[in-house]
């Protein structure tokens, strides 16, 4: 299981911790990942993701999981999230055609 957000692609960063005496120590900055269950209004089902805490705020800000995925770039989504996005777009197109 990689340490990467499935919806935004936020991943591990590396850098230095710098002390008062300017001594540098290499460190890894890990994203705050949470296992969450989000509900898709279009698909009428629950979907499990491993996302960063900041991503949860972004999902709510955009108006829910469906709106977030439709607006998100395909390159930053995980394969699982990309398949859910395609299902949502297909179902929304079918609903609009009726």
UniProtKB/Swiss-Prot annotation:
Gene Ontology molecular-function annotations: structural constituent of ribosome
Q: Which Gene Ontology biological process is one annotated for this entry? A: translation
- Out of the domains of life, which is the source? Bacteria
Which parts pass through the membrane?
none
**This protein's UniProt keywords:** Ribonucleoprotein, Ribosomal protein
> InterPro entries this protein is in?
Ribosomal_bL28, Ribosomal_bL28/bL31-like_sf, Ribosomal_bL28_bact-type, Ribosomal_bL28_sf
Name one cellular component (GO) term: cytosolic large ribosomal subunit
SUPFAM superfamilies in the record: L28p-like (SSF143800)
Point out the coiled-coil segments of this chain: none
Asked if the record carries the keyword Amino-acid biosynthesis, the reply is: no
Keyword Ribosomal protein listed? The answer is yes
What family is it from?
A: Belongs to the bacterial ribosomal protein bL28 family.
Q: Any idea what this protein is called?
A: Large ribosomal subunit protein bL28
Lineage of this protein's species?
Bacteria, Pseudomonadati, Pseudomonadota, Alphaproteobacteria, Hyphomicrobiales
């Amino acid at each position: 299981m990689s340490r990467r957000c499935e919806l935004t692609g936020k991943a591990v960063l590396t850098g230095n911790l710098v002390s008062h005496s300017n001594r540098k120590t290499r460190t890894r900055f890990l994203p705050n990942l949470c296992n969450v269950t989000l509900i898709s209004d279009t698909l009428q089902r629950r979907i499990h993701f491993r996302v960063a805490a900041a991503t949860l705020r972004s999902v709510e800000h955009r108006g829910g999981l469906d709106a977030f995925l439709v607006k998100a770039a395909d390159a930053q989504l995980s394969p699982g999230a990309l398949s859910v996005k395609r299902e949502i777009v297909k179902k929304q197109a079918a609903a609009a055609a009726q």
